């Protein structure tokens, strides 16, 4: 089974009620990250990269798979994206490379007008006093790519 098919199969198996809880979504996303990741050949290099960048963990999930996961989350959220907004903060809090990247993708693509939030304020409130530069740059890049105005 191809990596994309394995991920699609995993996501299709998730119950619809999963989208009612940011905790359950975060747990499911942690399970989804390794799907499609090359075998442990890359393990030592991803460990070193994650450690040097200041992440809590780095599984080596390709960006294209993270984008597929973000698309699935946004599609299945329906009209109410409040759970996804809470998920952004939860993902930042876990401090994994995949979590930060997924949080950036979600934050950039949420309907901020409907949620009544400023994406830059959400980003600022999610960060701690010390963050990996890569994480901040990734979030800023995704927000700008999505057409969000700089503050």
Regions found by a protein language model. Give the residues of each.
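Alpha-helical scaffold domains
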Residues: 1-151
């Amino acid at each position: 089974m191809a990596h994309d098919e394995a991920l699609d199969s995993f996501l299709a198996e998730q119950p619809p009620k999963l989208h009612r809880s940011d905790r359950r979504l975060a747990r499911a996303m942690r399970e989804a990250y390794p799907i499609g990741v090359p075998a442990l050949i890359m393990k030592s290099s991803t460990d070193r990269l994650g450690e040097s960048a200041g992440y809590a963990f780095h599984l080596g999930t390709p960006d294209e798979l993270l984008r597929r996961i973000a698309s699935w989350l946004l599609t299945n959220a329906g009209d109410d994206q409040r759970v996804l907004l809470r998920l952004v903060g939860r993902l930042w809090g876990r401090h994994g490379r995949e979590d930060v990247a997924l949080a950036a993708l979600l934050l950039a693509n949420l309907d901020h007008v409907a949620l009544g939030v400023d994406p830059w304020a959400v980003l600022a409130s999610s960060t701690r006093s010390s963050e990996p530069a890569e994480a901040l740059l990734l979030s800023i890049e995704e927000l700008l790519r999505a057409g969000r105005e700089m503050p």
